[in-house]
Amino acid sequence: MITQIKTPRQKQRFLNACRGKLCLGATMPLAFALFGKSQPGRFFAGPTLALDVGGSTAWLAGHANPEELAGFLAFCGCEAVVLDEAECPPPTGWKRAKTHSVFGLAPGRQLPLPEADASLWQSLAKNTEPAAGKAADLLFPDRPSKRDDFYSELCSKRSRGLARVWTLEREGNIICTVGAYALANGQAYMACGETVEALRGKGVGGRLIVEMANALAAEGWMPVFLCSPERVHFYTRLGLEKMGEYVRYAAP
């Protein structure tokens, strides 16, 4: 039975289902710790299930009955769900849409810095404490509600030491950014790598990603990325290791 988390036992079920899961073992417990009280209708648990329905895409760790899951996700208005096919069968009637690959770097390991345009790289200043608002503006210029949510969540996490953002800047303008948006349970979930369109393809984004991953791994974190099929070659080229897969299913 999928139920809203209201008791210590239900909370423990949620955390147990997340434990040891790549990416989700960091993102879901951290989201619950920060927003479980203010967004009680977002987090649900079953005997072996953790479920976050905070947006149009649900995130699932563990296992659920396929028919019950399909009905529950439809009731919540979810358009998609991301799950581990090796552990959880898809919701009944839902269609396989996309495979997401997990790439990562073992704690303590270091990658060589990839090539980048030397003159461009030298012209940029690295900022390890950029303004959250400026990063949000770069990432979501045409989605004001998403930008505001991102800004609020980043501020909440960063003030607690649970997220980091790095940027490359020129004259105060962000040229490139990447962040670790969930530092929890030994994992550093990295995401939102973005370079301004005019300067893409020059290697600065990849080098910034590797620099941050190396720094986190040196501290004992395991940097992890969840990427779409079109980004697999990029992360492979950087030297990151493919560690697993999740699958996105779309509602009928």
Regions found by a protein language model. Give the residues of each.
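N-terminal charged segments
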Residues: 1-93
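Short amphipathic alpha-helix that is part of the acyltransferase structural core
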Residues: 1-27, 99-103, 107-149
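A conserved beta-turn-beta hairpin within the catalytic core of GNAT-like acetyltransferases
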Residues: 54-59, 182-190, 200
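Conserved acetyl-CoA-binding loop-helix of GNAT-fold acetyltransferases
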Residues: 65-72, 191, 195-197, 201-218, ...
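Conserved GNAT acetyl-CoA-binding A-motif
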Residues: 76-86, 216-228
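Conserved active-site alpha-helix within GNAT-family acetyltransferase domains
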Residues: 87-97, 206, 229-246
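Conserved catalytic-core motifs of GNAT/GCN5-like acyltransferases
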Residues: 96-108, 241-252
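A conserved beta-strand-loop-helix scaffold within acyl/acetyltransferase catalytic domains
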Residues: 146-194
